[in-house]
């Protein structure tokens, strides 16, 4: 019986990771297409992206997040990611983008493996991580209207890197310890995608500021 449950959890984990990888591929296509999208459309697309995140949280309670929603979100977020990637590539060089992506991949792989194999249930981290993300969001909104200086943005990026690294650890750990049904596969893959992309953005900002200060 235990062996059957273990195999079932392994199967669910593999399917979640497969969907996650597919979202990254779709986001990459969106990133490529982003270079052809008029600047005037970036703000509406960014608003759509935020609206979809909020909608995903609401739909998650009803277990109504489907594959089409996740893939559409990945595509839109890939498009809106282009200006960020382009900005840091232009001021610090393309190698900074590769450095940030490589670091994100390594951190995700290492912490994801640790979280998935850890016997301890990390569900106690949920409230802390939620507060941390909300705080980061508030600071991010403040930065739009009153831009932070380089030192403050560096600190913001470091904190963001820590928070989303912990989210990777937490989410993979919860996939192991929670009873994940098939209808939750899309939303769990979306959670991993958001962890990965936000970690990448924070590392890109960190390396970009570091390189521009040299």
From Swiss-Prot:
Instruction: From the Swiss-Prot or TrEMBL record, state where the protein is found.
Output: Cell membrane
A Pfam family annotated for this chain is Bax1-I
Q: Where in the chain is the site Important for activity?
A: 171
| Record key words, sorted | Calcium, Calcium transport, Cell membrane, Ion transport, Membrane, Transmembrane, Transmembrane helix, Transport
Which GO BP terms sit in this record?
A: calcium ion transport; regulation of proteolysis
What is one term from the GO cellular component aspect held by the record?
A: plasma membrane
| Result after altering residue 171 to N | Mimics the protonation state and can nearly shut down the calcium flux
Activity regulation description: The calcium-release activity is mediated by two factors: pH and transmembrane ion gradient. It was proposed, based on an MD simulation, that the conserved aspartyl dyad (Asp-171-Asp-195) regulates Ca(2+) binding, pH sensing, and the channel pore opening and closing, and that protonation of Asp-171 probably weakens its interaction with Arg-60, facilitating the opening of the channel. Another study using nanodiscs suggests that Asp-171 is not a pH sensor regulating the pore dynamics; instead, it is only involved in the gating of calcium ions.
Report a single Gene Ontology molecular function.
calcium channel activity
Q: Which reaction does it catalyse?
A: Ca(2+)(in) = Ca(2+)(out)
- Give ranges for the Extracellular compartment: 38-44, 87-95, 147-151, 208-214
Q: What is the protein's major site of localization?
A: membrane
- What's written under domain? BsYetJ in nanodiscs is structurally different from those crystallized in detergents. In lipid nanodiscs, BsYetJ conformation is pH-sensitive in apo state (lacking calcium), whereas in a calcium-containing solution it is locked in an intermediate state, inert to pH changes. When crystallized in detergents it shows a pH-sensitive conformational equilibrium between a rather flexible pore-open state seen at lower pH and a pore-closed state seen at higher pH. BsYetJ appears to be a lipid-sensitive membrane protein: differences in membrane lipid composition lead to changes in functional sites.
Family designation: Belongs to the BI1 family.
PANTHER family recorded: BAX INHIBITOR-RELATED, PROTEIN LIFEGUARD 4
Q: How does it assemble?
A: Monomer.
- Describe the function of this protein: Calcium channel that probably plays a role in the regulation of calcium homeostasis. Uptakes calcium ions and mediates calcium flux in proteoliposomes in a pH-dependent manner. When expressed in E.coli in the presence of high extracellular calcium concentrations, shows calcium-leak activity, increasing intracellular calcium concentration. It can also mediate Ca(2+) flux from the endoplamic reticulum (ER) when expressed in permeabilized mammalian cells. Calcium transport activity is also detected in ER-like lipid vesicles.
Question: Can you name this protein?
Answer: pH-sensitive calcium channel
Provenance organism: Bacillus subtilis (strain 168)
């Amino acid at each position: 019986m235990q062996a059957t449950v273990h195999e079932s959890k392994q199967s669910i984990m593999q399917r979640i990771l497969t969907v996650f990888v597919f979202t990254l591929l779709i986001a990459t296509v969106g990133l490529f297409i982003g270079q052809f999208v008029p600047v005037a459309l970036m703000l509406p697309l960014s608003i759509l992206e935020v609206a979809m995140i909020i909608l995903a949280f609401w739909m998650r309670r009803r277990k109504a997040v489907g594959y089409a929603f996740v893939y559409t979100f990945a595509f839109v977020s890939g498009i809106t990611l282009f200006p960020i990637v382009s900005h840091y590539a232009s001021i610090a060089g393309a190698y900074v983008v590769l450095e940030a992506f490589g670091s994100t991949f390594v951190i995700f792989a290492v912490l994801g493996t640790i979280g998935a194999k850890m016997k301890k249930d990390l569900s106690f981290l949920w409230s802390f991580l939620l507060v941390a993300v909300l705080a980061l969001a508030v600071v991010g909104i403040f930065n739009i209207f009153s831009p932070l200086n380089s030192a403050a943005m560096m600190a913001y990026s470091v904190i963001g890197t820590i928070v989303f690294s912990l989210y990777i650890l937490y989410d993979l750990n919860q996939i192991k310890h929670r009873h994940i049904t098939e209808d939750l596969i899309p939303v769990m893959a979306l959670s991993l995608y958001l962890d990965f992309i936000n970690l990448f953005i924070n590392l890109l900002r960190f390396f970009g500021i570091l390189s521009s200060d040299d």
